[in-house]
Structures are given as C-alpha cells and as structure tokens.
C-alpha cells in the first residue's frame, strides 16, 4: 500500500491543482492512507468531486480496506482500463497487484495466476524498466494453488455457535516446553480430533507447526516462502462451523515456533469470513450469533488491510494506526514515540523490552510513560505505566498494538466483519 501512496502523489498532484476542494481532500486521504477518514468523508463529498477517477479510487480503496475485496476487483479493473492516462502506469500496476491479491484471497487461484502471467508478458513486451519479482511470486504461488478449490465456510446459521476457550494451551506436543499462556485457545477439530488453536487476530493466515502438520497428514503444496510451506486441509471444524479447502502455512521453525511452542493458529484468512463473533470474557467462550449486532453510532471503526485488523483510535494528536492483535501483548512502537516526542522529554526511566512476530524476536530500548489516553468510538481508554520504544524496530508501520490485555479489559468484545466494527462492553 505504501508504494501506491507515493505513486498517487506523483501522478495525481498535477491534476488536483485545478481540482475542486473535494477532489483535493479525497486525494489527500488516499495519499496518507487515512482509510477511516476516507470512509467517513467520502459519502459527504462524493457529489462535489470533479474527476470521476478520484471518486472511483475512493470507492475502490474503501472496499479494499473494509473487507469487500471482491467488489474492489471490478473497480481496480475500471481504473486500469479506463483511467490509466489520469492515474499513470505506476498506479495502474499497484492497482493490478492489489486486484491479484484479491483474486487469491477470494480463492480464484487460476485466474490470479493467468492474470499475473499476462501482466508479466506485457511488461516484458513493453521494455519498461520495471522490476516484477512480486508478480513472479504471485504467479508461482497461485499456479501451485490452482488445483485446489476456494475455501468455503459452511454455517447453517440456525442457532448460535458457542465455542469455549481457555487462556492456557494444554495441547503441548513437545516435552519440556512451556506453552504460551494468557492467550485465547479454542478447540478446532481436524479428522475427528480436537486440537488447541490460538485465536489470533494479528495472524494474517492460519498456521500449523510442522510437527502438528505431519501428525494430521496435510497435503503439502509445491510452494514455499521465507516463513514456511503451504499445505492443504480438506476441512476443519470450529464448533458447528466447517471450513472446507483450507490453505494453511506450515511454519519453518523460527523462534515463534521453537520458543513460544505454538502449534496452531486460527488466522484472519478464516476468521474474517465469519460475519460476527462475540468474545465473552466472563464465561470464557466465543459466540457466533445468529442475530447480528447493530452498527454503533460511530459507524465503521474496524478495517482489514492485507488481512491485518486495525481499530479507529484517536488521541490528542489525531488518528493512531492501531493494530488489533489478540496474539500479542498491548504495546507501543517507535512511530508513536515520534508523534509524542515533545511530551516525553522530561520523562525518566528506561528498560529493554522484547517484541516479536513471525519474523522472530528483537529487543529495543523504551521509556516509561506513567499514563496514556486515547479514545475508541468515543469511549475513553487509559493505559498506565506503559513503555514506549525510543529506538526504531524493523517492520513497524503501526503506532500501537492493542493486544490480549486490551481484549481482557472488557466483559464482551464483539467483532463484526460484515459491517466492520468492534464494540467493547
């Protein structure tokens, strides 16, 4: 997404110099990746937009970031085919890559492979000085996946599905290892046997350790990445909900596997296909309700970008990029420090903290902050005695991670993936 931002700045600025104020505002929101503001302001400004392609870009990016990726495909296609002169070839390529990702996430693997291959041929024929390793990888992966059907969710939706959870992983396959506690673990049934899966809103894909994958007999796919190999599962069950044709990542044994001893993760690739779930921290259960919740007055306050979940969080400095990650602890990043650096000048007390994700673990130095205030959907959230890193760590694009301790602050947390909102009670 960041690549697209700079391309749009370069190609759209000459056009919006003479554009109306609405066009300039929409372009600004797209160029700054301010998707929550774009979603709220676009309906108010759409009738004042002068250039059709600006409105179409807004609608495409709203669909892209609010779990309507199949709808976004057609909009990207129109932008590429009908508005390439206005948006430029660079932006068109970025939109094409997004569309390919959407084809894949929607299970249209053969179409994704064919279109990626066609785009590669076009670039070669044009002689344009464009590198396309991402396109080659998309083609290779989807060609390998093309023999499989798309993932489907079978949910009769006649009664609430209630799934119990525990905060400790009791299904440890390796002796002399300590399981990760203080996370949501739910029973997922594969071939008649229940296994403990971590419910992880910070995981973009469903994950299996190799030891568990070999135990259940997955079908390995002829594709691997730095993180591991892809594998096929014919089905798995979460209560009365069945996921068929599941593509999982079998991890290659980085510290996430060997240190944390996590054998299975239910990731956002499957979770976001559920219309709604309600985490009940009082009764230790997750409910998939038949009757869905009403959208809160504040509207959409949850977005899904590249299968990462983000919450609409504000503080006195403005909007914060807040990753919602039930598989991690709540924490801040160096980006947050930069936004609030002037406030931290007189603070004392530092310590080394360790952060980690699928890339592994890293340590950084952080400053002690007695209290941090922010708001979600108009509700105040106060965090005390937090540590904010003052040294940059790799692969950080967010300001804050709202982790498991955020979830556990509330009796109930509702996540609605149809209308894209979170409600905390």
Regions found by a protein language model. Give the residues of each.
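Bacterial Sec-dependent N-terminal signal peptides
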Residues: 1-26
